[in-house]
Curated annotation (Swiss-Prot):
Subcellular location: Cytoplasm
Record site feature (Important for catalytic activity), residues: 119, 141
Superkingdom of the organism of origin: Bacteria
GO biological process, one term: fatty acid beta-oxidation
Subunit structure: Heterotetramer of two alpha chains (FadJ) and two beta chains (FadI).
Record gene name: fadJ
Pathway(s) this gene product operates in, as recorded in its UniProt entry: Lipid metabolism; fatty acid beta-oxidation
Primary localisation category: cytoplasm
Name recorded for this polypeptide: Fatty acid oxidation complex subunit alpha
Keywords, ordered alphabetically: Cytoplasm, Fatty acid metabolism, Isomerase, Lipid degradation, Lipid metabolism, Lyase, Multifunctional enzyme, NAD, Oxidoreductase
Family annotation (InterPro entries): 3-OHacyl-CoA_DH_CS, 3-OHacyl-CoA_DH_NAD-bd, 3HC_DH_C, 6-PGluconate_DH-like_C_sf, ClpP/crotonase-like_dom_sf, Enoyl-CoA_hyd/isom_CS, Enoyl-CoA_hydra/iso, FA_oxidation_alpha_subunit
Enzyme Commission number(s) from the entry: 4.2.1.17, 5.1.2.3, 1.1.1.35
Natural source organism: Aliivibrio fischeri (strain ATCC 700601 / ES114) (Vibrio fischeri)
Gene Ontology cellular component terms for the protein in this record: cytoplasm
Disulphide-bonded residues: none
Length: 687
């Protein structure tokens, strides 16, 4: 065996070379700049013995991952575009050497095969993957504001055709084994136990390239077909990205250039565009977010070790309760008991759980047997039957302080001695909910966002006497549910709702001043939010906003006083999407601004401001409030504030979050902006 640290190879009796990748002292394989010399040495040795080798299998020495991608620190270490381009060219050169070997090369894939890992696999003649749920293939570079820089933009379209390649590269989606096989990304998907044997069989085959179908050729290889596809792809992508993600145009350019000018020039363009993107502020912000998320995954929320959780209880069978029950089973793999005061509520929760599982079944993510097994993990009760076995109870009843206090008392009386009570409140102080509790140290806030299965953030809110063990336990549970938890101080609005409120209030003021509904939403969509503020009000519910705003005003002062809009809409039964009309009127899946709203609110709609001014009027109060939250210790760090805003309310990720955005603007420019807007519109813009 030739040992080169992360890369070692040997040859078996069938004259198959086995190249094993096993990065020392790391759980996951990642491609690092320092490995270039090691890979070069291994390839030199293999090429020297090529007359005695019939095929090559590339495999991982890790138990559950192939290659998770390239080490992102390599890009951060690049001082300029020239260094970034050299980095990409080095990867391209090494992978080209693998492609040029005179015998068949096979990637034997088990576990994540992402980014540079998939680009390595694409340089092989064949790809064989395990059919295990751990196995996922993808090119997620676009999510970091980059593009695949080691041949991915050139090899994937040539392998599977233009349309599916665009879908994979532009979205950064991860493919499961069945989908990868169907698309032709892999040549076989087999049980993990026989992966090596099947890979060896492929290694003994002749070198082969997949032939595109006539339809794929027509779309990919002739200029007319290509022009149609690229034109449509650019329109669709930019409609979604609104020019805020330069990686999208760069990806389209690289693929089109390669198909038009050939592989060599395509690779050159790929390296150039990779280097340009690596230097953009958008990529820097997205990579910073990636590092923040990676760092946060290691944190427990406190110094205490979390308790083991097997059984979870949920109080309330509504949308929130049903969603919490679902992720506790489907993601966290817990057994759940859900309690509601009547069977209708329980039925709603069962249906909610079933419908989401059935969606997974239809997408072939789970089998029918797995669906049935996960349905059996949910038990519904109308009394406190079985609560003695529950480790954590998550309360998701109405926003009523007395009711929540009653739930605390009942659970601590009916449950096990050390049961944790987590309240999913969006506005009520956790300390007040814990008043009179037998064990206040076991009470904590756990604020989910709707819809639970889609929204990634959870706010963990300890009150003054919540124990460290309680904090670390619910943080661990939230992570198991697939959530990103941030620990925030017990104060009105916590963090996310507190910074959202002034943003929404400013949008309402703009509406009352005559800015049309669709113009307001478009302005913030252009800024980078996934949903405009008026649409968001409809989604959340006008009545919910009306309940939260007075609480914030009472606790935090006049700057949270909301315009006189909400009650008028509520009196007219305009609660938003759930009642089919709010600011918009909803017909099936379509919506349009309801012109009657203008009459109701005595508004003459006429746009007076630029979209940029509209956006800044809404965003600046949010930034000011975020800074106050940090100064008051509501959040522990700028990092937590950025993550909370991005994953809780959709603050534009390419800006890095409110604090990264403020740092990018600079203290002087931000202060000038605030003063200018304060002079025009009022003191609420002054920090």
């Amino acid at each position: 065996m030739k040992n080169t640290s992360a890369f070692a190879w040997t040859k078996d009796d069938e004259q198959i070379a086995w190249l094993t990748i096993d990065v020392p002292n790391e759980k996951m394989n990642t491609l690092q700049a320092a490995f270039a010399e090691q890979v070069t040495q291994v390839l030199d040795e293999i090429e020297e013995q090529q007359a005695h080798i019939k095929g090559l299998v590339i495999q991982s020495g890790k138990p559950d991952n192939f290659i998770a991608g390239a080490d992102i620190n390599m890009i951060a270490n690049c001082q300029n575009a020239s260094e970034a381009q050299a980095l990409a060219e080095k990867g391209q050169h090494l992978f080209q050497r693998i492609e040029d070997l005179p015998f068949a090369t096979v990637a034997a894939i088990h576990g994540p095969c992402l980014g540079g890992g998939l680009e390595l696999a694409l340089a092989c003649d064949y790809r064989v993957c395990s059919d295990d749920n751990k196995t996922k293939l993808g090119l997620p570079e676009v999510q970091l504001g980059l593009l695949p820089g080691s041949g991915g933009t050139q090899r994937l379209p040539r392998l599977i055709g233009l349309l599916p390649s665009l879908d994979i590269i532009l979205t950064g989606k991860q493919l499961r084994p069945k989908t990868a096989l169907k698309l032709g990304v892999v040549d076989a998907s087999v049980p993990h136990t026989i992966l090596s044997r099947i890979a060896a069989d492929f290694a003994l085959k002749k070198k082969a390239k997949r032939k595109l179908t006539a339809k794929e050729w027509g779309l990919s290889r002739n200029p007319l077909g290509r022009n149609v596809i690229f034109s449509q792809a650019e329109k669709q992508a930019q409609k979604k990205a609104r020019g805020n993600y330069p990686a999208i145009a760069a990806i389209l350019d690289c693929i089109e250039h390669g198909l038009d000018k050939g592989m060599k020039k395509g690779l050159q363009r790929e390296a150039e565009q990779f280097a340009r993107l690596a230097m953009t502020p958008e990529s820097a912000a997205l990579r910073s977010l990636f590092f923040a998320m990676t760092e946060m995954k290691k944190e427990k929320g406190s110094d205490a070790e979390p308790k083991s959780i097997d059984y979870v209880g949920v109080l309330g069978g509504g949308l929130m309760g049903g969603g919490i029950a679902h992720v506790s089973i489907a993601k966290a793999k817990k057994k759940v008991t859900i309690k509601d005061i009547n069977n209708d509520g329980l039925l709603n929760a069962y249906q909610y759980h079933y419908q989401r599982l059935d969606t997974l079944r239809k997408r072939r993510i789970i089998s029918k047997a797995q669906l049935q097994q996960q349905m059996l993990q949910l038990t519904g009760v109308t009394e406190f039957d079985g609560f003695k076995k529950l480790d954590v109870v998550v309360e998701a009843v109405f926003e009523d302080l007395n009711l929540k206090q009653e739930m605390v008392k009942a659970v601590q009386e009916q449950g096990k001695e050390d049961v944790i009570f987590a309240t999913n409140t969006s506005s009520l102080p956790i300390g007040q909910i814990a008043e009179g509790a037998q064990k206040p140290e076991n009470i904590v806030g756990l604020h989910y966002f709707s819809p639970v299965e889609k929204m990634p953030l959870v706010e963990v809110i300890p009150h003054a006497t919540t124990s460290d063990e309680t904090i670390s336990t619910v943080v661990a549970l939230a992570k198991q549910q697939g959530k990103t938890p941030i620990v925030v101080k017990d104060s009105a609005g916590f963090y996310v709702n507190r910074i959202l409120a002034p943003y929404m209030n400013e949008a309402a003021r703009l509406l009352l001043a005559g800015e049309p509904i669709e113009v307001l939403d478009e302005a913030l969509l252009d800024f980078g939010f996934p949903v405009g503020p008026i649409s968001l009000l409809d989604e959340v519910g006008v009545d919910i906003g009306a309940k939260i705003m007075p609480i914030l005003e009472a606790e935090l002062g006049d700057r949270f006083r909301s315009p006189d809009v909400f009650q008028t809409l509520i009196d007219d039964k305009r609660l938003g999407k759930k009642t089919k009309r709010g600011f918009y009127v909803y017909k099936g899946k379509k919506k349009e601004p309801d012109q009657e709203v203008y009459t109701l609110l005595n508004i003459k709609p006429q746009s007076q401001l630029s979209k940029n001014e509209i956006a800044m009027r809404c965003v600046l109060p949010m930034l000011a409030e975020a800074k106050r939250c940090l100064d008051e210790g509501i959040i522990a760090s700028e990092r937590d504030g950025d993550i909370g805003a991005i994953f809780g309310i959709g603050f534009p990720p390419f800006l890095g979050g409110p604090f990264t955005y403020m740092n990018t603007l600079g203290e002087e420019k931000l202060a000038t902006l605030m003063r200018n807007y304060a002079d025009k519109y009022g003191d609420r813009f002054i920090e």
